[in-house]
Amino acid sequence: MYCRRSQLKKPSMSHRTHYYWIAHQGTPLHGVLSIPGDKSISHRAVMFAALADGTSRIDGFLEAEDTRSTAAILARLGVRIETPSFTQRIVHGVGVDGLQASDIALDCGNAGTGMRLLAGLLVAQPFDSVLVGDASLSKRPMRRVTDPLSQMGARIDTSDDGTPPLRIYGGQLLRGIDFISPVASAQIKSAVLLAGLYARNETVVREPHPTRDYTERMLTAFGVDIDVSTGCVRLRGGQRLCATNITIPADFSSAAFYLVAASVIPGSDITLRAVGLNPRRIGLLTVLRLMGADIVESNRHEQGGEPVADLRVRYASLQGTRVPEDLVPDMIDEFPALFVAAAAAEGQTVVSGAAELRVKESDRLAAMVTGLRVLGVQVDETADGATIHGGPIGHGTINSHGDHRIAMAFSIAGQLSVSTVRIEDVANVATSFPDYETLARSAGFGLEVYCDPA
């Protein structure tokens, strides 16, 4: 059954309706597109505003399932949040010591960022909490966060295999630590820094590779004194946050699908407005340019403390490349889109050092390799990457594994298919990009949404 857009306004993986896409060749992409607000920044903005003294206004908030889950949890903890419009939030902060206990488990849905950051916040509270998630989030590793928090004096229980739910015991006295992160992860860093706000003395986080600095930039915007140097962040405990107004830029990870689509669909010429270009987020932009993409920045400025620019993208004949391993942490969420760009390019594209893809919402490495093979693309899989051999893209049915980024990536592949590509289990796109189909079709995608009773 074909589904009207109104039926898909707020789909959920818990619904009994099964949603799928049929993607096929459309027209060259054209137009000026406004991408929704950055998901990572939206999580942090509403969370830090809740901890601030005073009232904060957030513009450009991402209205999606993941960010709604975080906002709903904060409301459950006693924070009053108003929604004057779809992309605005007015947050009446309660201060660092004003959160209240919840009498039910706090449901993060599919939001891994929300769960990990909230863990860092809740370990410092005087009350117990339980963080739960959906089936996908309940399979994701959490010890990488709970271990350093435990070193700070927190008490957290996970399931036997280190996955959610997280049972957090309040009333613990936290101490600052000098933590060397075993992996490059902004979520780990952010959880430790949030706990560090409540800890005695100084908290230091050292990283093997610099990661996204959204937390550092936003804490500064809220008046927190934080020292940042290459690969190292220092935070003194006991500081308070001051309310401020935040304008959130467009999400680069969401823009990535249009960057790739316009680069590989002949005749395309689009402009993406006010896209966030955090230096630790734009590895894909660098790699696409290495492949010969025609992407031009203009109107560069700062928005919400983040570098922002308009991006004009025109079709170009891409060439395969070897992805520099030092860029992998800066594009970890964009690899599904890159794999499709590689399939459309001439020659081979080699990815290595990307084992982290196996512990995202799905095993993204396996999902992309399997899906491209279904479409007739030659791909050689390794433990931490793959070699993609560019060539014609065929037709077939793709299992997205309920992963929003896998689904959106293969919608691009469908535009290059000799026939059609059916993409199963796409409701979870609402976690990050609820209006994806509407925007894609307006730009020229051939993309229909269907639903069947499960």
Swiss-Prot record:
Q: Please state what the protein is called.
A: 3-phosphoshikimate 1-carboxyvinyltransferase
Organism listed in the record: Xylella fastidiosa (strain Temecula1 / ATCC 700964)
Q: Name one GO biological process term.
A: chorismate biosynthetic process
The catalytic activity, as recorded, is:
3-phosphoshikimate + phosphoenolpyruvate = 5-O-(1-carboxyvinyl)-3-phosphoshikimate + phosphate
Gene Ontology CC annotations of this record: cytoplasm
Chief localization: cytoplasm
Known EC number(s)? Answer: 2.5.1.19
Key words, A-Z:
Amino-acid biosynthesis, Aromatic amino acid biosynthesis, Cytoplasm, Transferase
